Amino acid sequence: TRGFVAEQIDVFVGILVSFFQRQTVICLIEGVMYGTGFWLVGLPYGFLIGFVLGVMNLIPFFGSVVCLPVALPLAYFVHGGSLTRLLLVLGVWVFGQFLDGYFITPKIQGDKTGLGYAGVIFSFFFWATVLGPLLGMLLAIPLSAFCVILWRALKAKYIRPVV
């Protein structure tokens, strides 16, 4: 069993590495998406703020917590800002969250981990509840993928068909 445990640890490390590689790609996509959106609605320093927001989402939602408190006052108070611009910036963020949560992350992470769209979304909810919001959201996909792979390995090793 020592060999089996070592093999599963290697599998888990591989899952973590590939997860963070894909998460980096997602963050870059989000950065360009938010940056372009903020720039298009006329937010001062919009591309920079949006890009930083996307990249900081390596820890899920961290970029939003840090960047929205900067972006929203800028949209309202700087260079003829208005409630309209503030709502446009907020709209870009909401639309980006929708795209990320339902399409970008599930597609990129779900296809490679074997979890699928629903599995990715469920894993976020489950692990955020079990480990807390920050650690749970950060490790949700690698932990779920490892659980699936471990289950398959244990099933193949210990469960024999009856028929």
Regions found by a protein language model. Give the residues of each.
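Canonical bilayer-spanning transmembrane alpha-helix
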Residues: 37-56, 107-155
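Alpha-helical transmembrane segments and their immediate interhelical loop/hinge regions
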Residues: 1-74, 83-86
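Hydrophobic alpha-helical segments typical of transmembrane helices
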Residues: 4, 32, 103-108, 122
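Hydrophobic transmembrane alpha-helices
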Residues: 52-62, 69-77, 91-99, 126-130, ...
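Membrane-embedded alpha-helical segments of multi-pass transporters/permeases
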Residues: 31, 35, 39, 76, ...
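Internal alpha-helical transmembrane segments of multi-pass membrane proteins, especially GPCRs
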Residues: 17, 21, 87-91, 122-123, ...
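Alpha-helical transmembrane segments
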Residues: 76-88, 93, 97-115, 156-163
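Alpha-helical transmembrane segments of multipass membrane proteins
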Residues: 26, 30-34, 96-100, 132, ...
